[in-house]
Amino acid sequence: DYASALITSVPKKITVFIENSNETTIFDTINKTSVGLHEENSNFTLVQKFILFLTEYTSCNKTFALTIYNELHNDDKKYGLGSSGAVLVAIARAILSFENVSYNDLTIFKLVALFNIKHNLSGSMGDVAASINDGITYYEKFNAEFVNNMIRQDKSVKEIINTDWDGLRIEKVYPKADLSILARWTGEAVDTKEHVKLWKKHKDNYKEEFRVFVKTSNKLVKTLKENLERTDATSALNTIRKLRENLLYLESFSKIPMETKTMKNYIENHSAGKQSGSGSGDIVLGFEKNNDKYQLQLNLEKL
């Protein structure tokens, strides 16, 4: 709770189309199959539950055919690009638009985050925050206990969404620094949920160390945000190096691996670098000063 992060979107999209239909069906380009809203299929369970959850908010029971075009997965490869959060964001926008329910980006974030909390889907919700913006997003995580208290009080979905969430901040960042982010797929898949479970199991033994880690991380993230906004690529690279050092400090006491050997080699071949997400797989980031403007290059060939 209250932890901050800078998260960037990637030049890959999830697009959702909806059209009127006699019954509600879901088709996606990954599974290449269509299922009914109440039809049993493990590949669609999350989406089916989310659609039913949205009806609590919209109070609308229109039937429709929903199609999901997903560029964040390909050829059965998991890239670690936050696709589950992005899918739910795209579905929420499509359904609310289809049902003529007004919304803004904050509404969409809260709907997806609340659904995840109610279904015990752990995580920072950073992928959700990144999915509502293009480019870089500054995100401060809400106080989860504040939201859980509203759930325990049996407040309606609409009441919870319309309440200001303690600690939540989502802000679009406009980078001016001449910096290139070189994002590369490692080919080594990692499940963020497993890292979260592992940390929850051991965190009570390292309360002070974790407090130091979070305090340092939040300070460095704010510094990096300022570096990016002030055309200060040199300072940004230095801040990124310090962020990596802090993550390796977390690794030292949490025993959660941050970098594989492949990732270390990639990072050390760039001016600065770090893992993406919870570490140990999926995407690794290299950073270089350039002579043009801020840019992100995503390479999904296996490292």
What is the predicted role of each segment?
Residues 67-68:
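Hydrophobic alpha-helical hairpins/lids featuring a short glycine-rich hinge
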Residues 80-103:
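DPxDG-like acidic metal-binding loop motif
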